[in-house]
Amino acid sequence: MADNDLKVIVKAKELTFHSFNLTSNCDRYPKKYRHSLSDKIQIKCLDIQYELLKANRINNVTNKQLRCETITNAITYCDQLLNYIELSMRLKLVTGKSAEYWTSMVSDVI
């Protein structure tokens, strides 16, 4: 983790690490949810990170609209991730307390 990373990028990296740890656990996410849910969660976290890194590289003065669109994409991906977390809780793959913590990590990124 670089010292000059924006706080939101650091939070997105922490979210990705946490999400990969949870969804890679076969006891928590059995094989039947591997492709339908856990892979989607992992990919969505990587997408969030990518969009934030991309937005950080866009010049805010010359390409303000593109930067705003990229940040909006990241926020939309966070919304999708929140839906996957809720689904995980409803399927009893994670506890309410775990989902609450995970949701707070997503909120830190938004």
State the predicted function of each range.
Residues M1-I110:
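Amphipathic alpha-helical assembly/interaction segments
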